């Protein structure tokens, strides 16, 4: 008997997308989307590349990232009128970082719907922070294209309401050392090493921290060792995000 031929291209995409009932997902998001746009929002580059370099959801992610950032920034501006710009910026980081987005994605059950390549599936891609976070942004991009900014904004405020309310705490005290450890675990990289030195008189010391992860070296400074280490860890996370 001849072996069944593996589907590729649009046929593979339609077959994979058709395996799921997307009504529960759209209900969780509280919106409707046409199949072609929803299918694109759920198509990870690993699936697209394995099936003839199909279009993937990265352009929608780009759009959704902008929508999310503006919606959250405006809400923080209105909800916390007494806060300085520097505080609002940190608060926004606490709401829209990869781990916060991944948390929202898990709550919505996104992992069960993302179309992944075989390699990503085998390495637990449907529960990776980065993939889940990207899927939230691509969905927001799709919602914006189909419904406009007001619906997209309302969706953001509904899904992120708790995180926005908690932003004065989570955003201003973000544990960058923990975030870095989670990032390294996702990327299968070794643990970081920290070196800290202090300069200046005892009553007014400045601490300088260095984080090393293989060939990546980042630096931070502050008036305590903890602040310096967290500043260096934050720089490391940002550099790793650029590489991802």
From Swiss-Prot:
Q: Where is the RNase III domain?
A: 21-148
Query: What does the entry list under GO cellular component?
Result: cytoplasm
Q: Does the keyword RNA-binding apply?
A: yes
What does the UniProt entry say about where the protein is found? Cytoplasm
Q: Which UniProt keywords apply?
A: Cytoplasm, Endonuclease, Hydrolase, Magnesium, Metal-binding, mRNA processing, Nuclease, RNA-binding, rRNA processing, rRNA-binding, tRNA processing
**What family does the entry list?**
Belongs to the ribonuclease III family.
Q: Name one GO biological process term.
A: mRNA processing
Task: Provide the catalytic activity annotation.
Answer: Endonucleolytic cleavage to 5'-phosphomonoester
- Which cofactors are required for activity? Mg(2+)
The active-site annotation reads 65, 137
DRBM domain sequence ranges: 175-242
Quaternary form?
Homodimer.
Enumerate the Pfam families for this protein. dsrm, Ribonucleas_3_3
Q: What is its main location?
A: cytoplasm
Which molecular function GO terms apply here?
Answer: double-stranded RNA binding; metal ion binding; ribonuclease III activity; rRNA binding
| Its job | Digests double-stranded RNA. Involved in the processing of primary rRNA transcript to yield the immediate precursors to the large and small rRNAs (23S and 16S). Processes some mRNAs, and tRNAs when they are encoded in the rRNA operon. Processes pre-crRNA and tracrRNA of type II CRISPR loci if present in the organism.
| Binding-site residues for Mg(2+), renumbered to this chain | 61, 134, 137
The entry's protein name is Ribonuclease 3
CDD domains reported for this sequence: DSRM_RNAse_III_family, RIBOc
- Family matches, as Gene3D superfamilies: 3.30.160.20, Ribonuclease III domain
Q: Which NCBIfam families match?
A: RNaseIII (TIGR02191)
Enzyme Commission (EC) number: 3.1.26.3
List the coiled-coil residues: none
